[in-house]
C-alpha cells in the first residue's frame, strides 16, 4: 500500500513540476504591473486548481464516453428477429399493401356541412 501512496505522491509531484515549469516559462516577458499582479496570484497558489480541473474534465469525458459506448452497444443488440420489431415492420408493410390494393375501391365522396347551409356564396 505504501508503494501506491508513494506512486500517487510521485505522480502529483511530477504533474505539479510540469505545470509550474510551464506556467513560469509562459510569463517571461512581463511589465512591472504584471509582475505585481503575478505576485498576488502566486500568493494564492492556483497550482492545485489546474490539477482539479484536469481531474474533473477527465471524469466528465469518461462519463460521456461510457454513455456513448452503452448507447452503441444497446443499438447493436436490437435484432430484426425481435417480435416487437417484426410487428412494426409487418404492420407497415401490410398497411401499404392494403392501401395499394384497395385503390380501385376508393370512390370520391362529397361531405356537406349542414350547419353552413344558411350561408350563401357570392357569385
Swiss-Prot record:
Subcellular location: Cell membrane; Apical cell membrane
Effect ascribed to mutating residue 65 to L: In LQT6; uncertain significance
Consequence of substituting residue 27 to C: In ATFB4; gain-of-function mutation associated with the initiation and/or maintenance of AF
Impact reported for residue 77 to Q: In LQT6; uncertain significance
Any GO CC annotation of this UniProt entry: apical plasma membrane
Record has Transmembrane as a keyword: yes
Subunit structure: Interacts with KCNB1. Associates with KCNH2/ERG1. May associate with KCNQ2 and KCNQ3. Associates with HCN1 and probably HCN2. Heteromultimer with KCNC2. Interacts with KCNC2. Interacts with KCNQ1; forms a heterooligomer complex that targets to the membrane raft and leading to currents with an apparently instantaneous activation, a rapid deactivation process and a linear current-voltage relationship and decreases the amplitude of the outward current.
Protein name as annotated: Potassium voltage-gated channel subfamily E member 2
Amino acid at each position: 500500500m505504501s508503494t501506491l501512496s508513494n506512486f500517487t505522491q510521485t505522480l502529483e509531484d511530477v504533474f505539479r513540476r510540469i505545470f509550474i515549469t510551464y506556467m513560469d516559462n509562459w510569463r517571461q516577458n512581463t511589465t512591472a504591473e504584471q509582475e505585481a499582479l503575478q505576485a498576488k496570484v502566486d500568493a494564492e497558489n492556483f497550482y492545485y486548481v489546474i490539477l482539479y480541473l484536469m481531474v474533473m474534465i477527465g471524469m466528465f469525458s469518461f462519463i460521456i464516453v461510457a454513455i456513448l459506448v452503452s448507447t452503441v452497444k444497446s443499438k447493436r443488440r436490437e435484432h430484426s428477429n425481435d417480435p416487437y420489431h417484426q410487428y412494426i415492420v409487418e404492420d407497415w408493410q401490410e398497411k401499404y399493401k392494403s392501401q395499394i390494393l384497395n385503390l380501385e375501391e376508393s370512390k370520391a365522396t362529397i361531405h356537406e356541412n349542414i350547419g353552413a347551409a344558411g350561408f350563401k356564396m357570392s357569385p
